[in-house]
Amino acid sequence: ARKMAARKSLWKAQTGEAFLCSPEGVFPDKKMRQAAYKNLTEAEKYIREAVPFKESVTSFDYNADGHNEYLCSMEKYTACISARGGQITELNVIHNLENYADNLSRIEKFDKVNDNYERGLFVEHVFSKEEFSDYKKGLPSGCGVFSKALFREAEFNGTKKEIKLKGEGTYSNLDIPISLRKRYLINSNGFMVQYILKNEGPIAFSGNFVVESNFAQTDFSNADKNSYKLDLISDGNGISYETADEPVVKKDISFVQITDTSSNISFVYEPNEEAGISCQPLLFKRPDLNSETPQIAENTFTASLFWEFDLAGGMEIEKTINFTIITPKKRRTKKI
């Protein structure tokens, strides 16, 4: 019975509705795409209930783009990590069957700015002071070197559930060579992500190292509604934003909890040393069948941890983030 139910969910996901332009507008298109992910994850859930489930991390070129992806099939979620940007391009939470990495990117024709990179989770940038000032305002600021980089595999161990990637690029108009080593250690509840940013050249430089994550809209009751709640610990003091509808920038952050109020699922970030944070909702527009004027197609909540740094030639800095998915049944409480 479970296998039959799983097959029906797969059929629903494969009907092709997610690829059609609805006469109802572009926002319902997003809802249909999320429904397709939901049906796929539901099929996965049925199969897990029918046969013994074993957590795994595998490496294969699943989308036939010439580069391996890493598929993490864990107790609370499934995730796909791409070599492009070294980022999480799918994050399907088993509890509510949603894909939290299903985000658009801004296109100048419709959104008046170009992002020039894909908006997943754990997307890294290196910005100058001026670029970072624009970034915090949601303005065009370039791709930040690593968000468009093709990361290569340094080491993969499926048994240890460990992925090591390395990205390379150049910084500023001086073309300073820099590299970023990125280590994912995958567990049942989330990830530990370790970074080593290195100045590969002889010239010292300073900047901001930014780790960006984008959370897709799951509440479709209102196109421009932000359904995420934000809780922070800044310099030992708790700060809460019931709906973070405006940009938020804070420093001395040791704890971040982003909660999807439509499902009560939380995502917790705990950096190994205090960081800054920049958060804001972003609206994406696309044309629909009934109007040449772009309409709201999606609302994404963007949260970025950042650190200022100075790097002499040949030197490096290390940062680590623990990322935990908390479902309603087992919620960790922390005084804030």
Regions found by a protein language model. Give the residues of each.
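Histidine-centered catalytic/metal-binding microenvironments
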Residues: 1-91, 95-122
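Beta-strand-rich recognition/accessory modules
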Residues: 55-62, 146-147, 155-179, 188-192, ...
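Glycine- and small hydrophobic-enriched segments that form the cores of compact globular domains
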Residues: 71, 77-78, 82-87, 91-167, ...
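Short, isolated positions in well-ordered beta-strands
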Residues: 77-80, 248, 317
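Polysaccharide-binding surfaces and accessory modules of carbohydrate-active proteins
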Residues: 189-192, 198-276
